[in-house]
Amino acid sequence: MAYEDLREFIGRLEDKGELARVKHEVSPILEMSEVADRTVKAGGKALLFERPKGYDIPVFMNAFGTERRMKLALEVERLEEIGERLLSALEFRPSSFMDALKGVGMLKDFMSFIPKKTGKAPCKEVVAESLDKFPILKCWPKDAGRFITFPVVITKDPETGEMNAGMYRMQVFDGKTTGMHWQIHKHGAEHFRKMAEKGGGKIEVAVAIGVDPATLYAATAPLPSGISEFMFAGFIRKERLKVTECETVDLLVPANAEIILEGYVRVDEMRVEGPFGDHTGYYTPPEPYPVFHITHITHRENPIYHATVVGKPPMEDAWLGKATERIFLPILRMMHPEIVDINLPVEGAFHNLAIVSIKKRYPGQAKKVMYAIWGTGMLSLTKIVVVVDDDVNVHDMREVVWAVTSRFDPARDVVILPPSPTDSLDHSAYIPNLAGKLGIDATKKWRDEGYEREWPDVVEMDAETKRKVDAIWNEIRNMVL
C-alpha cells in the first residue's frame, strides 16, 4: 500500500522503531544540523524535532539516512526491484540508456500512472503570509543564511508544456523571495533558458515541501526530458499520485504535500546566492542565480517541515544516491551487457568516481566501458572511472585497491580526456562546469593488449579444503573471533 503522504511514512518509521522524537528545544539555526550530522554518521534513526526553538512547526530530518529506511521509503526489499520492473516493461531493445528510459515512458504500463487530479487538497488547508513562520534551517556556520533543502521544484517547458519536478536548494532572502539554485545541467534551468530565448518575462514555479517519499525520490532521479517525475513516482508507488491545481500559477502540485509555495522567476533578474555547505564537503562559493518571487503560500493543518543537511559525506543524501545507483543498474546492464556491477562511492559525492566491474571478453573492453559511462546521461559528468574484472567486488574498497595496485600500469592503462562537462559543484575544475576526466583500466591484461607475460593465478584455497573447514568452522570461530 503506497504512502498517501509524508505523515504515513513517518508513522511507518515509528512502527518499525526507526523514528526518534526529539523533545528537547533545538534551534533550526545550526543546532539541528549538528544533531542530524552526528546521527546519520552513526547510522541512527530518523529525527522528528518536536520543539524547534522559536517555532511551533516540527522538523523532520534524516528520513533516508540508512539503507533500511531507503527501502522502507520506496517500499521494496531490494532497491534493484524498481529498475527490474522498468526493464521488464520494455518491449524493444533501445539504442541508448536515455532511449530506454524514454521507451519506458511510452509504455501502457507506465502511462497508467498519470497523476490523478483532485480538488480536495490537504496542502491548501491554511493560507500563510510569509516564509517566516517555517523553521527553515541554517545548516553550517558560513552559510549565507537559511536554505530550503528538500524542495520539489515544479516548472513547465515553455515549448512543450511538459512539467518537470526537480530538487534545487533555495536560499531564503526574505519572507517572499528565495534563490533558485538550478544548475546548468538541470531541467529547471533548461526551462528558464527557453523562456529567456522566447523573450518571455518570467517562468511560473511551484514548490512542494514535505511530500511522500516516492515523489521526493523521483524529483532527484536522472530522468530524461519528457518523462514525468510524477508518473515515475506513481510507478514506484504502484499507485497514481494525487495532484491539485495551484491557485496563482498554471501548475500541478502533490495534493498531500505539507507546504506549497507558488510564484515566478524573472528571466532578467539574478541575485548572489551562497555560500552553502554542500554535499561535496565544501562550501559552494557565492554565485548569481535566479530569484523566486512567492505569490501564494499554503500548508496543511499542523504542518511538518521536512529538511535535510548535506556536507562532508556520508550524509543522508548518500542513500538517495545509492537508490539511483541500484535502480538504474538493470537498464545500464541491458545497454552494456558486459557490466556486472557499479559502485558510485559516497565519499566521491557520486559524480566524482565510478567503479565498474565487467565480464571481459575482448581486448580494450575496459576502455569501451569507460567511454560508455561518459556517454550515458548524468554519468557523463563522472570525473574518474575505474574498471575492474568480475572477480572484484566493487563495493569492497579493499578488493578495489588490490585490483588497481596489482592490475594497473600507469604508463599504459590510463585514459585521460581533455576538459569535458563536469558537475557544477566540482571545485577542482579550473573553469566552472569543465574539467578533465580519468579512466583507470584495472582489469587483467591479455597478450592481445600488449601484455607479454603469463598472468599469474590468484591465491585462493581449493574447494575440498574449504568444505572440510566449513564443517568445523562454527566451533572454531567461537574460539578465535
Curated annotation (Swiss-Prot):
Q: Which Pfam families match?
A: UbiD (PF01977), UbiD_C (PF20696), UbiD_N (PF20695)
| Superkingdom classification of source | Archaea
> What GO terms in the biological process aspect are recorded for it?
ubiquinone biosynthetic process
Among Gene3D superfamilies, the record links this protein to:
Single helix bin (1.20.5.570), UbiD C-terminal domain-like (3.40.1670.10)
Mention any one GO cellular component term assigned to this protein in its UniProt record: cytosol
> Which molecular-function annotations from GO does this UniProt entry contain?
3-octaprenyl-4-hydroxybenzoate carboxy-lyase activity
Instruction: Tell me its family.
Output: Belongs to the UbiD family.
Q: What is this protein called?
A: Uncharacterized protein AF_0209
Recorded source organism is Archaeoglobus fulgidus (strain ATCC 49558 / DSM 4304 / JCM 9628 / NBRC 100126 / VC-16)
